[in-house]
């Protein structure tokens, strides 16, 4: 079974299978190449991806996905149970094969192999992701990668938590919405909270 077909054996990261770009990367012979390139260029500009765009898209999609592993690891300070760790390791081994295949197919691509977007937005902790999925020597079973990814989710979160430095309450819609551009607030800029500042300092 090749790595693209093997992706359908994912247990935790199954939502990746419904991503149109991931599906196009899985079935390169079924998609018109310029159509896929167009989708990837749009994604690169919207997400601020740079470098080998299909690879960067996959790394971003993997850590942005909300699933039981990402939610439990973030909620429990990076600690998960043995059963969940085995399931995550299973998926990581499968994703490694696919990520490696995509890397090799696109690393020398004239358009997508070394792309620079209009506005670059670095993916937090990208070097950890590269270590987990591309440079995994000595971790054939994926267990070390699970520990690193638990730490990643604990440090950075997943989904919207990765993309926003701050959050504000949207009273009309009654939910937290991400704020990408916010001013840095320091104690000397706060007025009327002298008692609270004393307690915190």
Summary of predicted features, one role per range:
Residues 133-136, 175-199:
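Dynamic helix-loop-helix/coil hinge segments at AAA+ ATPase domain boundaries and subdomain interfaces
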């Amino acid at each position: 079974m090749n790595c693209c077909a093997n992706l359908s054996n994912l247990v935790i990261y199954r939502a990746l299978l419904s991503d149109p770009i991931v599906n196009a990367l899985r079935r390169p012979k079924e998609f018109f190449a310029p159509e896929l390139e167009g989708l990837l260029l749009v994604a690169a500009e919207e997400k601020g991806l740079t470098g080998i765009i299909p690879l960067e898209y996959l790394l971003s999609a993997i850590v942005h996905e909300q699933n039981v592993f990402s939610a439990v690891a973030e909620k429990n300070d990076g600690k998960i149970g043995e059963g969940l760790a085995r399931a995550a390791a299973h998926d990581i081994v499968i994703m490694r094969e696919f990520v490696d295949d995509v890397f090799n197919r696109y690393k020398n691509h004239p358009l997508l192999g070394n792309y620079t977007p209009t506005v670059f937005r670095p993916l937090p902790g990208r070097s950890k992701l590269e270590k987990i999925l591309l440079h995994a020597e000595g971790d054939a079973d994926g267990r070390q990668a699970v520990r690193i990814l638990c730490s990643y989710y604990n440090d950075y979160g997943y989904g919207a938590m990765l993309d926003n430095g701050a959050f504000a309450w949207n009273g009309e819609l009654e939910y937290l919405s991400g704020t990408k551009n916010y001013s840095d607030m320091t104690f000397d800029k706060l007025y009327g909270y002298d008692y609270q500042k004393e307690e915190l300092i």
